[in-house]
Amino acid sequence: MDFLIVLKALMMGLVEGFTEFLPISSTGHLIVFGNLIGFHSNHKVFEIAIQLGAVLAVVFEYRQRFSNVLHGLGKDRKANRFVLNLAIAFIPAAVMGLLFGKQIKEYLFNPLSVAVMLVLGGFFILWVEKRQSRAEPKIADVDALRPIDALMIGVAQVFALVPGTSRSGSTIMGGMLWGIERKTATEFSFFLAVPMMVAATAYDVLKHYRFFTLHDVGLILIGFIAAFVSGLVAVKALLRFVSKKNYIPFAYYRIVFGIAIIILWLSGWISWE
């Protein structure tokens, strides 16, 4: 394998892992960064691999929690509610994605839409943080979430179908807006990422498996490992961060990044293939 291609695959995996769980839109970062470094994968298999690497970072970080849930399923009330809440939160975006995913990609997957959603999302985060600073959150533990709370987070996740919104951003801010404490909303967003991303990965594999070749294995493994490691770092770092601080820095970053996308696009530095 060419060293430069390997390096680019490594960098793309790192970008996916670092941005997937932050409220800053991993999709926007992958497209912009891929254009800037000249990395153009021939098919979806590489993207599927790095997404899977990122989601497995959450499974690894919370392996004890998931193990307890699996062993307690059907017997333990907390485990049953946890799975029920994930299922409820999963459904809205899954249904809307199946119904309108093709149209969303056709009409909204462009620099202007992504940039606008990044900027609007940044201002939305500022508003939610200001609102929560004035009110005491009602729910401060994932195990205290009710099915109605999970449903509201699931409804918020529907907005993440629009490129540039950020899945983690929509679920975390949706949870906080509903009265869930910042760290609790963040953790539930991590947990919800597992069924959402596994389902999306399985769907993409069924659609694109025929494009897989043994020639791609090396790059796929490099991207997968990079996404797993960087995803693990991002999850740990974000949990520490939100234990003491708020999401306002990410809001400003989104606004600046959204404006930067427009500038890069208009100047011809990035394309949107």
From Swiss-Prot:
<protein>
    <recommendedName>
        <fullName>Undecaprenyl-diphosphatase</fullName>
        <ecNumber>3.6.1.27</ecNumber>
    </recommendedName>
</protein>
<keyword id="KW-0573">Peptidoglycan synthesis</keyword>
<feature type="transmembrane region" description="Helical">
    <location>
        <begin position="13"/>
        <end position="35"/>
    </location>
</feature>
<feature type="transmembrane region" description="Helical">
    <location>
        <begin position="250"/>
        <end position="270"/>
    </location>
</feature>
<dbReference type="Pfam" id="PF02673">
    <property type="entry name" value="BacA"/>
</dbReference>
<dbReference type="GO" id="GO:0071555">
    <property type="term" value="P:cell wall organization"/>
</dbReference>
<keyword id="KW-0812">Transmembrane</keyword>
<dbReference type="InterPro" id="IPR003824">
    <property type="entry name" value="UppP"/>
</dbReference>
<keyword id="KW-0997">Cell inner membrane</keyword>
<feature type="transmembrane region" description="Helical">
    <location>
        <begin position="186"/>
        <end position="206"/>
    </location>
</feature>
<keyword id="KW-0961">Cell wall biogenesis/degradation</keyword>
<dbReference type="GO" id="GO:0050380">
    <property type="term" value="F:undecaprenyl-diphosphatase activity"/>
</dbReference>
<feature type="transmembrane region" description="Helical">
    <location>
        <begin position="82"/>
        <end position="102"/>
    </location>
</feature>
<keyword id="KW-0046">Antibiotic resistance</keyword>
<dbReference type="GO" id="GO:0046677">
    <property type="term" value="P:response to antibiotic"/>
</dbReference>
<comment type="similarity">
    <text>Belongs to the UppP family.</text>
</comment>
<comment type="function">
    <text>Catalyzes the dephosphorylation of undecaprenyl diphosphate (UPP). Confers resistance to bacitracin.</text>
</comment>
<dbReference type="GO" id="GO:0005886">
    <property type="term" value="C:plasma membrane"/>
</dbReference>
<dbReference type="GO" id="GO:0009252">
    <property type="term" value="P:peptidoglycan biosynthetic process"/>
</dbReference>
<keyword id="KW-0133">Cell shape</keyword>
<dbReference type="GO" id="GO:0008360">
    <property type="term" value="P:regulation of cell shape"/>
</dbReference>
<feature type="transmembrane region" description="Helical">
    <location>
        <begin position="45"/>
        <end position="62"/>
    </location>
</feature>
<keyword id="KW-1133">Transmembrane helix</keyword>
<keyword id="KW-1003">Cell membrane</keyword>
<dbReference type="GO" id="GO:0000270">
    <property type="term" value="P:peptidoglycan metabolic process"/>
</dbReference>
<feature type="transmembrane region" description="Helical">
    <location>
        <begin position="108"/>
        <end position="128"/>
    </location>
</feature>
<keyword id="KW-0472">Membrane</keyword>
<feature type="transmembrane region" description="Helical">
    <location>
        <begin position="219"/>
        <end position="239"/>
    </location>
</feature>
<keyword id="KW-0378">Hydrolase</keyword>
